[in-house]
Structures are given as structure tokens and as C-alpha cells.
Amino acid sequence: MKKAMLGKKIGMTQIFDENGLVIPVTVVEAGPLTVVQKKTVETDGYDAIKVGYVKVAEKKLSKPNLGQFSKTKLAPMKHLKEFRLEDISGFEVGQEIKAENMFQSGDKIDVSGVSKGKGFQGVTKRYGQRTGPNTHGSMYHRRIGSMGSGTNPGRVFKGKKLPGHMGRETITVQNLEVVRVDSDRNLILIKGAIPGPKGGLLVIKNTVKSGK
């Protein structure tokens, strides 16, 4: 059964298992989410739910986004996300979804987030390209190097690794394990590291791979 959740990255810490081994975990505040809309095969051609996350003042939303909440008379939400699920019969508009409703300890999940932005960077930092000599009068240290032949083909090939914007990309880490779910504080402890800065928005889904 497909499961999905929105969350906010809190940070990393470590816990001990029953054998006394240290487990590095990332703490994620998952939900609570509010069901804003239900989509069905009859009306939309597929089954899905649209959820909202983090209440926000009306003045901070655009008119199109506000319109989605005015129809259902729900409080405005900062984030809206649609999840296609196999069975939406258990969800109703206005219903609150908590972390414990979706995931349990031992579940395998995929986590997607936006990586930290690094700005404009050169090829050494962006791709790990080797630097030139630092001594003996060399003027070539962290430069690009050759970008191709001159006369033939006389152009730079597509995909050539060049300086440019680094980071701020959607990254998905697959097959992570849920170590613990704190239902009182809506926290999920996930084994290992996940992308994004502290406070970054995350999409958590049950894994698409078996992990064998």
C-alpha cells in the first residue's frame, strides 16, 4: 500500500539500540497534515488526496492558493502536495493525518528534499576536478583546463563540466529505515542522513525498491 507524508528536517542526533550500538538518525517533524481535497476516478480520472502542511497567514498566499482553502473553509496552509494513493476511502476533507497513521518502526522509506545551495562554483568544488601545480611558476591552479579541440569540432560539447550553479537540486535518498516514531510530538527518526538544510521541506514515501 502506498504511503506518503510531508515533513520538516529538524537535525541529526544518535540513539542506542537494544544491543547498545549507536545509530545515527535524522529527526523529522512529520505532519500533522490536513486533507484539502479528494480526487476520484469519476471526477478527475485517478484517485488522490491533496494535503496541506504548516498553517500560514492569508496575506502570504496568492489568490489561486487561497481559493483552494475558501471552498472547504479550511485554514490556509503554506505547502500543498498531491499524493496518488491506491485507496483513499479512509480519507475525508478536513481530516488530520499524523505520522503514526502512515509509518511505523522498521518501515523502509524514500526521502526527497532540496539540497543545500552552494551558489556559483568552479569545477574543482563542483565536480572534484584535479587542480594544477601550485608551485614552479605555474599559473594554472583551479581553472577549467581544455574544453575541446579548436578547428575540429570547433565547439564545446554538450555536457562538458564547467563552472556554474551548485546545489539546490531535488535529491532522493532511497531505502532508508524508520527507527522510531514519536506520536506525541509527530517526530520520525530515520536512520542515516537525508538531503536539505535544517527546516527544509521533505517528502517521505514508502520505498519503491525492496532493498535486497
UniProtKB/Swiss-Prot annotation:
Keywords: Ribonucleoprotein, Ribosomal protein, RNA-binding, rRNA-binding. The keyword Phosphoprotein does not apply. PROSITE patterns: RIBOSOMAL_L3. Part of the 50S ribosomal subunit. Forms a cluster with proteins L14 and L19. The gene is rplC. This is Large ribosomal subunit protein uL3. The keyword Ribosomal protein applies. SUPFAM superfamilies: Translation proteins. One of its GO terms (biological process) is translation. GO terms for cellular component: cytosolic large ribosomal subunit. GO terms for molecular function: rRNA binding; structural constituent of ribosome. InterPro entries: Ribosomal_uL3, Ribosomal_uL3_bac/org-type, Ribosomal_uL3_CS, Transl_B-barrel_sf. One of the primary rRNA binding proteins, it binds directly near the 3'-end of the 23S rRNA, where it nucleates assembly of the 50S subunit. It comes from the Bacteria. Belongs to the universal ribosomal protein uL3 family.
